[in-house]
């Protein structure tokens, strides 16, 4: 019986089960050759589905490889460097015209300067950017009639700036500054044209072409470390920027106070100069009067009489003679007193 059972042909169900057990496992990767494909079994629908899936995966793998090859070819193409400012080179700012009138402030800037100092006094623990944000929010919510006050002041300041600028443009200082600015602009253009006209050395050009492009694959530890370093650098730059803004605000306030102090000192200097000129005129008139009144009073022991040029020396010598010989100089003293009484009258 056992031999008979083993010799009997297998049924269709046994054939399907045996085929499933002996068939190759499902496709787990991308195959580029057709030799590893499973044989075709028309009586097994499961194998047909597996072969279709394998063929689809194979085609998609070939397409991916083709696309990756195209990407490699594109990456291997030399990348031309865009024109622009040279890395690491700083732009030079044009020198400021110190003689020019002060630029006008807008209404918002006036409100911000006034309100910012109040907030820094009331809330010293709040950082500078937060104060700026609070001031901006208050300005947007400020009523129109209160906001109009700052806008009117800004308009007056603008009119003042326009008048002062028109007056300044007619001065020699502005003409000198304008000529210097034009000469600097011409020199800069000539330097740029000279740099463009000089051919690049072939050796330097080959070095630039062979220089590797900084490329880090994503989803790697190196990329994460690079991102962390950049984020730390950005945080440090933001912190430095905030500190510089606060320092700039403090320096701006100090500059304004220094300007007001300079203006006050200039006004005091003008007053003192006017007072000095008046005193100089009065002194000159006193010298003339003394010279005229003391023409007949010589210094004791000499025949020297005063003149307009020697009146100061004459008065000094006369005083020394009177103090040295007071008894002999009583007549001269009485005469000088009469002259001075007439002068005071």
UniProtKB/Swiss-Prot annotation:
Residue ranges with Basic and acidic residues bias: 112-124
Polar residues: compositionally biased ranges: 32-48, 57-67, 167-180
Any Pfam family matching the protein: HMG_box
Keywords: Coiled coil, DNA-binding, Nucleus, Transcription, Transcription regulation
Compartments it resides in: Nucleus
The UniProt record lists the keyword Transcription regulation: yes
A GO CC annotation given for this chain: nucleus
Superkingdom per UniProt: Eukaryota
Coiled coil: 227-290
Nucleus recorded as keyword: yes
Gene3D superfamilies hit by this protein: High mobility group box domain
Biased composition (Basic residues): 80-94
InterPro entries on file: ChromReg_NeuronalGeneExpr, HMG_box_dom, HMG_box_dom_sf
Chain positions covered by the region annotation Disordered: 1-124, 167-198
DNA-binding region: 101-169
Job of this protein: Plays a role in neuronal differentiation.
Protein name: High mobility group protein 20A
Organism (species): Xenopus tropicalis
């Amino acid at each position: 019986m056992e031999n008979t059972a083993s010799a009997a042909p297998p049924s269709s169900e046994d054939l399907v089960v045996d085929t499933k057990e002996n068939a190759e496992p499902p496709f787990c990767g991308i195959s580029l050759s057709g030799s590893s494909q499973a044989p075709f079994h028309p009586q097994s629908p499961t194998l047909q589905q597996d072969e279709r899936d394998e063929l689809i995966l194979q085609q998609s793998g070939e397409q991916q490889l083709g696309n990756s090859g195209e990407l490699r070819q594109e990456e291997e193409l030399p990348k031309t460097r865009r024109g622009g400012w040279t890395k690491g080179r700083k732009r030079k700012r044009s020198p400021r015209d110190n003689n020019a009138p002060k630029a006008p402030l807008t209404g918002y800037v006036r409100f911000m300067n006034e309100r910012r100092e109040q907030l820094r006094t009331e809330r010293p623990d709040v950082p500078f950017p937060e104060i700026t944000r609070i001031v901006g929010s208050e300005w947007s919510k400020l009523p129109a009639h209160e906001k109009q006050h700052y806008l009117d002041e800004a308009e007056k300041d603008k009119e003042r700036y326009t008048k002062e600028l028109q007056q300044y443009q007619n001065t020699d200082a502005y003409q000198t500054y304008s000529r210097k600015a034009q000469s600097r602009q011409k020199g800069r253009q000539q330097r740029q044209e000279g740099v463009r006209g000089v051919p690049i050395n072939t050796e330097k050009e080959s070095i630039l072409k062979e220089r590797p492009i900084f490329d880090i694959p994503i989803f790697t530890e190196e990329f994460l470390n690079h991102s962390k370093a950049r984020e730390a650098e950005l945080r440090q730059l933001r912190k430095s920027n905030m500190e510089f803004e606060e320092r700039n605000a403090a320096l701006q306030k100090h500059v304004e106070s220094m300007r007001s102090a300079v203006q006050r000192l200039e006004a005091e200097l003008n007053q003192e100069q006017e007072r000095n000129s008046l005193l100089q005129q009065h002194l000159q008139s006193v010298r003339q009067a003394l010279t005229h009144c003391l023409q007949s009073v010589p210094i004791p022991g000499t025949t020297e009489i005063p003149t307009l040029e020697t009146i100061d020396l004459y008065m000094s010598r006369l005083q020394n003679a009177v103090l040295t010989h007071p008894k002999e100089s009583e007549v001269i003293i009485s005469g000088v007193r009469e002259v001075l009484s007439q002068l005071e009258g």
